[in-house]
Amino acid sequence: MRIAILTTGGTFDKIYFDANSEYSIGEPCISSILDEGNVMSDYRVQSILKKDSLDITQDEREIIKKSVIECEEERIIITHGTDTMVETAKFLEDVKEKTIVLTGAMQPARFKKTDA
């Protein structure tokens, strides 16, 4: 059974250019993380947003919800920034017949010591 991984940005995919600079949200890192962990499960990755979760609007939560509802997979992982993950989870609570897991990171996946 295939798992859908929907990415929204957050710390998971942040890129810092140096210790004093701003960041950007890069391409999703989840495939390389799973490859590095020798994960052999069937999955597909879909990038929905590339934002810090503090910048996600209610309209964008609607986009996330629509993507979840339209997803053919019943098992869905959403990578999301930790600051507003709870708000998005509450927004998705009425989606039925799908198992939805939101996950985030405190350190970007591109860092050597990451929790992504």
Question: Model features per residue range: what roles?
Answer:
Residues 1-116:
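Active-site histidine-anchored catalytic micro-motif
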